[in-house]
Amino acid sequence: ATTLLAAADASVGGKTAVDTPLATNLIGLFNQPRKVYIDIAAWKTLPKRQMASGMAETIKHACLASREMFEFIEENLDDIMSFQKFACEYIAENNCKIKYDVVMKDERESGLREVLNLGHTVGRAIETVSDYRLLHGEALSIGMAAMVLLSARLGYMSEEEAERVTKLYERVGLPTRIPDYIDREALVKKLYTDKKVRDGKLRFVIEKGIGDVVEFSPNVYAKPIEESLAREIIMEL
């Protein structure tokens, strides 16, 4: 892995997929790597925009599984973005650990692995509707802003913690508002291409405070959400 996005996400999990005009990552298979090599020195060659994009998945992992990691990022963000070894090694190791722990319990995404989709219901839809003008991490950042707003609206997360997540994304330099050029009604329709949709119903992974997600019933981590509420959240961003 020579980028932070690859180190945080693509290199761990075993999914090898391709994008389609309909949506991203729709066609693929599972093939687990035997080892993952992360070259932190290569991160120094990245444009700032690409480094920030990788931070989107990094913060997502902290949000779903590690309050300690979230607080480390808050306190050491400048060191991460200036490629200090101790800080970069910390996020590289913890990204891999969090994703590995989830994937090894649910490789085929029959339940628990859905938590890795935190923020992606809106995020992937924005990525596609933007015609990929937004990088994956930029779209995910907006998706995470939508997710914490929804989590707070449903009473699973305090408004203070929701704002804390959004502020951290903004400190990285990532967007948390939907660009004006995106048609919001088209975005609402695109939500239905999300892989978590069941029986025509939108389903969202919901955050339960920083470092945890809601398990709605045994091995069920996504909640059906009415389109009207999803539209309301999107119109606010």
Question: Where are the language model's segments positioned?
Answer:
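Active-site segments that bind and position negatively charged phosphate/pyrophosphate groups
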Residues: 71-186
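C-terminal charged capping/lid subdomain of soluble metabolic enzymes
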Residues: 56-58, 156-237
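A glycine/threonine-rich phosphate-anchoring loop and its flanking beta-alpha core
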Residues: 2-78
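Gly/Ser/Thr-rich beta-alpha loop segments that engage phosphate groups in nucleotides
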Residues: 15-16, 30, 121, 125, ...
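Structural motif
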Residues: 45-51, 85-87, 133-136, 197
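A generic hydrophobic-helix recognition signal that picks specific residues
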Residues: 25, 32, 112-113, 202
